[in-house]
Amino acid sequence: MLTAILPVLLQQVSSLAPLHTPISAAFVAPTVTTVRVGLAPISLDGRLNEPDWMLVQPVTDLRQVDPDEGAVVSESTEVRILYDADAVYVGARLFDREPGKIIRRLARRDASTHSDEFTVYIDSYHDHRTAVRFSVNPAGVKGDQLEGADGEFSDKSWDPVWEAATTVDSLGWTAEIRIPITQLRFSSALEQVWGVRFEREIRRKNEVALFPFVPKTERGLASRFGHLEGLARLGTPRHLELLPYALARGNYHKPEDAADPFNPASSYYASGGLDLKY
């Protein structure tokens, strides 16, 4: 039911920090353009080989906050955003001249893996105060959280329904993300502008690069996002997602009577169900 309380939670946490965090006069929010697709669905396989990905210019100007603050990201990076009637798609081509050194550890959802990682932040309210964060590492480990009060508050207990697929190849690695419209909150305007930010971590270099770039000396998060333009006719989401699951379990115990056919030493159980979020 966490998705249902998202609007209330974000409004509450917005009051935890000063209403206005000073923004550097040098900061000008860059524009990211997206387009609507729909003739053929995006296949979430982590390969970015659908022609639709070429419909938009990639974001490439990520700059380091560590270790060389302000320098261009050391490995070329291209990020694109598409959307359709059901979801927002983020595709990232993360080039690496030494793909064999890409760090990709497995872990549970929301765990810190100390791996390479790609992250997208979205301020779908475009209030410059609140955002949602989606991250994935090359092994496909996902993370997500709410961001409030312009970066003063975060909540990892938020677990929306979304998907990600990754691939490591001779050029580096790719991340393909699908975020259902139902998991985001936005206005009813026909045409919209959202806030967006991209982040790449190259773990072996202790490197973190951002778009848009914000110096470490400046506070704030959503107030420093770029502007995502091109969104139109999103409609009113139904705020409902069903996530099927299956469970299996096996037991072994010492029976009281080994000859009793109705009391076997082993037993197996299976069940299934749906996680409902609205």
Outline where the language-model segments fall:
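Structural preference for beta-rich elements and adjacent junctions enriched in aromatics
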Residues: L2, Q11-Y278
